[in-house]
A protein has these predicted regions:
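Short, basic, glycine/proline-bearing loop/turn elements
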Residues: 49, 120-124, 154-155
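Non-catalytic C-terminal accessory region of glycerolipid acyltransferases
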Residues: 3, 132-243
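N-terminal membrane-anchoring alpha-helices
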Residues: 1-61
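Generic preference for hydrophobic
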Residues: 62, 76, 99-100, 207-209
Length: 243
């Protein structure tokens, strides 16, 4: 049975890679013909992501959309379980959203090209001098009315436990005066584990949208660590509710 799953997963992985290359090529062509970044992001949300989730055997369930005023920009903060998280979030969030990605992603063919063409931001780990510049870029993106999503744990969870949220990048939301939306992901780590495609299995992924956290109260900024702790607690509460 394990051999059969390995063969199946290898075939699906190859098909998903071809699907990804095709959609990215189409998005890059659209950008070259004058389409905006948001158009290319919607292509991912409405075309690429549903195909990836279907190929992986994912049944996506989204809860809490009614809690958010989608006419406003937000910083979305989510727990991180799997590389398929991005596809789930692209599909779940009803607005174009950019991601804060590892700097290594910029060098990956197709993925890096698409990320640059759609205004994604890149973080250089352990590079202290890049932090202030990244926060300014993120704040400018949010202030311009665009949504941004990041994984404040800093890396994917190996155990399924949600690590404490790092607060540094949340300063961008404070500077831009936009709210932070906690997002809970459940099931992605079982569909596509950190260990690789050999352990991949079809299954459900649940996405929960939390209540927006205002970054300013009576004109005064809320401390970013307090925001990180509250977002972390809200994500944990949604996950416990589903347990």
């Amino acid at each position: 049975m394990r051999v059969m799953w390995s063969i199946y997963n290898a075939i699906m992985f190859a098909l998903i890679m071809l699907w990804t290359a095709a959609w990215i090529s189409a998005a890059l062509l659209a950008r070259a013909c004058g389409a905006g970044e948001d158009f290319a992001l919607r292509m991912a949300a409405r075309g690429w992501a549903p195909g990836v989730l279907l190929g992986a055997g994912v049944r996506l369930r989204v809860e809490g959309l009614e809690r958010v005023d989608w006419s406003r920009p937000y910083l979305f903060v989510a727990n991180h379980q799997s590389v398929i998280d991005n596809a789930a979030l692209f599909r779940a969030l009803p607005v174009p959203v950019r991601f804060l990605l590892k700097a290594e992603m910029a060098r990956v063919p197709f993925l890096g090209w698409y990320a640059r063409a759609t205004g994604m931001l890149f973080i250089i780990r352990d590079a202290r001098r890049s932090g202030p510049l990244l926060r300014r870029e993120a704040a400018a993106l949010l202030a311009a009315g665009h949504g941004l999503c990041l994984f404040p744990e800093g890396t994917r969870s190996l155990t399924g436990e949600v690590a404490p949220f790092k607060s540094g990048a949340l300063q961008a939301a404070i500077d831009a005066g936009v709210a932070i939306v906690p997002v809970a992901l459940q099931g992605a780590g079982r569909v596509l584990p950190v260990g690789g495609i050999s352990g991949a299995r079809p299954g459900p992924i649940r996405v929960g949208i939390g209540v927006p956290l205002e970054t300013r109260v009576d004109g005064a900024p809320v401390p970013r660590q307090a925001l990180a702790d509250r977002a972390h607690a809200d994500v944990l509460a949604m996950l416990r509710q589903w347990a």
